[in-house]
């Protein structure tokens, strides 16, 4: 039987033989299932050759991954903190280098990308223009500092005036 667009149609065994197909008569392991096997000899009896895993990974690696780990860590030391999180997801070699860069470099140096104040650039420019200002820079939402007034000095002046 063969499936056509109209439905099933019976074909003779000669037509199957002409196509190079034949029925398997001995189907003990297959139960009632029928399979077709080509009578033509296959061109390649050997299974496809597997590529070694190191060859496939070498061809797929990027130029950044092919760098030596020490050089890769030095390159990653110049990347911002926020970008390191996305770089971890690239590959295993870059992930290892990111972890090493965090341990050795980012704990001690490289500042974060975002500035702590809204207009920090303007504040820094205004401070550089007027070098006479000795006031400390405070963030915009900092708690109010209580200023302690030395009241004893005021009382001493008043007492001197009163007891003259």
UniProtKB/Swiss-Prot annotation:
Residues 38-57 are annotated as: Disordered. Pfam families: F-box (PF00646). InterPro entries: F-box-like_dom_sf (IPR036047), F-box_dom (IPR001810), FBS1-like (IPR045286). The lineage of its organism: Eukaryota, Viridiplantae, Streptophyta, Embryophyta, Tracheophyta. Residues 61-109 form the F-box domain. This is F-box protein At4g05010.
């Amino acid at each position: 039987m063969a499936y056509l667009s109209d439905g099933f149609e019976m074909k003779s065994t000669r037509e199957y033989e002409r196509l190079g197909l034949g029925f398997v008569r001995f189907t003990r392991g297959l139960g009632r299932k029928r399979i077709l096997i080509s009578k033509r000899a296959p061109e390649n009896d050997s299974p496809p050759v597997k590529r070694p895993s190191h060859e496939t990974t070498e061809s797929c690696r990027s130029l950044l991954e092919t760098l030596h780990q020490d050089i890769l860590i030095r390159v990653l030391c110049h990347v911002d903190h926020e970008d390191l999180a996305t770089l971890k997801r690239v590959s295993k070699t870059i992930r290892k280098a990111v972890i090493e860069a965090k341990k050795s470099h980012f704990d001690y140096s490289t500042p974060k990308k975002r500035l702590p104040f809204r207009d920090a650039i303007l504040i820094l420019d205004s401070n550089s223009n007027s070098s006479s200002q000795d006031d400390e820079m405070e963030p915009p939402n900092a708690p109010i500092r209580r200023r302690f007034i030395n009241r004893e000095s005021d009382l001493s002046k008043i007492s001197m005036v009163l007891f003259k």
